[in-house]
């Protein structure tokens, strides 16, 4: 089998590339996905409110676990990643958050990455998006990804939580992806007007999968990339339960889009990475790149949970006897409780003036429950998910075997810097202050977690060690740049090799201030134009907020 391009991984970036490259009917593309289809009648992935379900099994989730995390009481921590058409956009929380403009401007300060500034990237965010209230300087109106805005009156807790943040002295913003990210406001979500999850399989592949020049193979586990000298010329993979490899050749390029955990793993198995690590598994060295699998970053978060004194939370939706009605409303009308992910309000703040842009993110949820659906509080409640955005902690992904089915060693080194501890202490204390504002007085009952007895630095630190969880945002393991630990250049091309790019969240040099899916899609759109040799979209002229040392909040 011969194709112009072989794409490994049908996730948030891979599906973008598959769709854009096959717009040219003379370009042939093979898209390999280790998981299965995105079954449209499976409510677990299609109903926004069911977002916890895919994380509980292994049909749609790689269900990785970390090595014992040394600063988290040696806990082995969850590291869920999407498996199936759509990748992690098939199982994520559907929050459409792009990050802060200064994240991208910060990337662009690295030599060679100048065209990754916010204003250079904004046209590609817009290209990918159809926002339900129409386009403007910041938002698109005819892109493949459906973005839904929060509507007033859905749940009084959303408005109350935003108002409480404002009463605590923080800004109000009407668009966390617009002129000003900093502040509290409604949260956009990747949900269709029909109340379905807007994964990249739905948004992109639906328009491309019938093209004769696109071949999609599911249940295709990539074993390794084939090289001729320093040039990538094809891919070998295992189909289903087969132990006999299948191979295809790429006339132009192999595009690795397997995500921050699997992309470095595939490079290492293919002979690209740290020479000592590869020698340990008798993998012939194709090219030494010590940065492959290093620079691993993530967002860590905690839940601060409160009893709700009024019966307005989602607690009744957790009762089995209410779920048939919720399911029917969603299935036949695309409406009701099932049609929202219920992350409809949130915010970004600076915990201290020393941060030039927000370093703390909030997601508000009108129920008290773990992200993966476990440990639901059996009463009316609500919670804040809160965590730091740009931790200095760095980890790694390293193969443990040549077997593609063997999970790699993953270590995030969460909370390995004093800055991490200070940010989380600040975050808990600020959150408590926000939760005790007048806007929440009629709803707020007792603090369920951490509990009012948890007050000192030592007590807060122990709570974080035992209870903080991943926000499922791994990135950075094939970082873009030109220093000795970089893996790809500013166009995603792997240093020292030909015919091979990495295009996914692994190339982010530094993690962004917010959820990763929107920016991963943008990366796919931007590099798709580079691959095709097309001129970049014209730079945006939109304005954006810069704090420039402003106080973090208004004085009361």
UniProtKB/Swiss-Prot annotation:
> Recorded GO terms, molecular function?
betaine-aldehyde dehydrogenase (NAD+) activity; choline dehydrogenase activity; flavin adenine dinucleotide binding
Q: In which pathway does it act?
A: Amine and polyamine biosynthesis; betaine biosynthesis via choline pathway; betaine aldehyde from choline (cytochrome c reductase route): step 1/1
Q: Which SUPFAM superfamilies match?
A: FAD-linked reductases, C-terminal domain (SSF54373), FAD/NAD(P)-binding domain (SSF51905)
Specify the signal sequence span: none
- Enzyme superclass (EC): oxidoreductase
GO biological process: any one? glycine betaine biosynthetic process from choline
Name the family.
Belongs to the GMC oxidoreductase family.
For this protein, the record's HAMAP family field holds:
Choline_dehydrogen (MF_00750)
Name of the protein in question: Oxygen-dependent choline dehydrogenase
């Amino acid at each position: 089998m011969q194709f112009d391009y072989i794409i490994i991984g049908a996730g948030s970036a891979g599906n973008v590339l598959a769709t854009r490259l096959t717009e040219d009917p003379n370009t042939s593309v093979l898209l390999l996905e280790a998981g299965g289809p995105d079954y449209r009648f499976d409510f677990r992935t299609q109903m926004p409110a069911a977002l916890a379900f895919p994380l509980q099994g292994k049909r749609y989730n790689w269900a990785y676990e970390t090595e014992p995390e040394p600063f988290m009481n040696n806990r082995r921590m969850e590291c869920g990643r999407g498996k199936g058409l759509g990748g992690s956009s098939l199982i994520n929380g559907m929050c459409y958050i792009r990050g802060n403009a200064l994240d991208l401007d910060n990337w662009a300060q690295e030599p060679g990455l100048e065209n990754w500034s916010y204003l250079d990237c904004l046209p590609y965010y817009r290209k990918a998006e159809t926002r339900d209230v129409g386009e403007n300087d910041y938002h698109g109106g005819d892109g493949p990804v459906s973005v839904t805005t929060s509507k007033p009156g859905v749940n009084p807790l959303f408005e109350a939580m935003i108002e409480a943040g404002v009463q605590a002295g923080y800004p109000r913003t009407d668009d966390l992806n617009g002129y000003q990210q900093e502040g509290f406001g409604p949260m956009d979500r990747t949900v269709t007007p029909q109340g379905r999850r807007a994964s990249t399989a739905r948004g992109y592949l639906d328009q491309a999968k019938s093209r004769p020049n696109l071949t999609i193979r599911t249940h295709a586990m990539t074993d390794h990339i084939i090289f001729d000298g320093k040039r990538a010329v094809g891919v070998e993979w295992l189909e289903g339960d087969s132990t006999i490899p299948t191979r295809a050749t790429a006339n132009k390029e192999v595009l690795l889009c397997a995500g921050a955990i699997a992309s470095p793993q595939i490079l290492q198995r293919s002979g690209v990475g740290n020479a000592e690590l590869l020698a340990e598994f008798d993998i012939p060295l194709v090219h030494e790149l010590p940065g492959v699998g290093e620079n691993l970053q993530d967002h860590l978060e905690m839940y601060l949970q409160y009893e709700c004194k009024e019966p307005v939370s989602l607690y009744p939706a957790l009762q089995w006897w209410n779920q048939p009605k919720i399911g029917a409303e969603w299935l036949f009308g695309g409406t009701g409780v099932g049609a929202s992910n219920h992350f409809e309000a949130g915010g970004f703040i600076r915990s201290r003036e020393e941060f030039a842009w927000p370093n703390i993110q909030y997601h508000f949820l009108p129920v008290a429950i773990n992200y993966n659906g476990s440990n639901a509080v059996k009463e009316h409640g609500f919670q804040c998910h809160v965590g730091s955005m740009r931790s200095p902690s760095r980890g790694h992904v390293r193969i443990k075997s040549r077997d593609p089915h063997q999970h790699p060693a993953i270590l995030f080194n969460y909370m390995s810097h004093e800055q991490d501890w200070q940010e989380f202490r600040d975050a808990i204390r600020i959150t408590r202050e926000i939760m005790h504002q007048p806007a929440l007085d009629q709803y707020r009952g007792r603090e369920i977690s951490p509990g009012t007895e948890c007050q000192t630095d030592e007590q807060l630190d122990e709570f974080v060690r035992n209870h903080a969880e991943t926000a499922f945002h791994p990135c950075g393991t094939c970082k873009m740049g030109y220093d000795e630990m970089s893996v790809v250049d500013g166009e995603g091309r792997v240093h020292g090799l030909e015919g091979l790019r990495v295009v996914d969240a692994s190339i982010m040099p530094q993690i962004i201030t917010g959820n990763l899916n929107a920016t991963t899609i943008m990366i796919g759109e931007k590099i798709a134009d580079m691959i095709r040799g097309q001129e970049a979209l014209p730079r945006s002229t939109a304005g954006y907020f810069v704090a420039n040392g402003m106080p973090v909040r208004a004085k009361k």
